[in-house]
Amino acid sequence: MPSPDAIPRQHSGRRIGTTEITQGNIDNNHIYLRSFFEEFPADAIGGSNRASAAQREIAVDWGGDTVVMTDLDGAKKFFRKRGWIREFFDRHGVRAGDMVTVEEIAPYSYRVAPQRRS
C-alpha cells in the first residue's frame, strides 16, 4: 500500500468516472460512486460496515492538506471514510447539481476533483 507521502499529487490520471452531487450528498458527507464502482480494485471494496472493511485501502487525493486512506463501502458504493468530504465540498464551493470527477493516478491511488462550471 502506498504511503500518503508517496502519492504523486500533480500527475495526470485516467478518468474513471464522473458523478453529479445531490443535496443528499452534501447533507450526509458522501459522494456516490455507483456509475463507475466496478473501476475500483475488488480487494479495496468491503462490506456495509467497518467490521467488514476491505483487505486493502486506496489513497484519495482530494486537494486538501492530507491524502485520505480508505476502503470502499460495497453496499452503499461510496468512500467509507468520509470526514474529508465536508471540507472538500466547502473548499471547492460544491453545490447540488455540480459534477465531481474521480481519476486513477496510480494503482490504488485516486484524485477527486470538482468539474469547473462553465
Q: What does each of the following model-derived ranges do?
A:
Residues 1-118:
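Acidic, low-complexity intrinsically disordered regions
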